[in-house]
Amino acid sequence: MKFPTDRPVKVVMLGAGGTGGYVAPYVFRLLHMLDRPARFVVCDGDIVEPKNLDRQNFVPADLGENKARVLAERYSTVLGMETEYVPSFIEKLPDLMELIEPKEWELNPYSTKRAKEMVLLLGCVDNNKTRQLCHQAFHQSEELIYIDSGNGKYTGQVVCGVRRNGRT
């Protein structure tokens, strides 16, 4: 499968803790290097606690702050890239569908040609309920790239799905 290289990109990441906290800087760098419009939305309703400092990508100055906000502000400041964040858990399908709705962009200010964003949903959550929500959104989407990751103490997995033209 080949993806167009001129379409704008939108990445929506659910979860900014153990997995999301380490995935975020790489996503920021990749989007920063693209030669096309890109948006990154980080979503998490959790706050940074002392127990998170040992295994998550946070520092003591982040304690008590929302995880999504910390990551969005940290890396957008470093890379000079505007970022959105949602400081709450995404628990309802309509909310997730709204987040992954592609926006149309003008490709060139001298042309009327427009292109819809290519949307990537990153699941970096630690609960099955949200994974099921992402699965529902994936199957209801006309076009979506969905990458889900999960891990235990000694194991982990990554699953990827691609929908184009309403087909998986």
Residue ranges and their predicted role:
Residues 1-168:
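Adenine nucleotide-associated cytosolic modules
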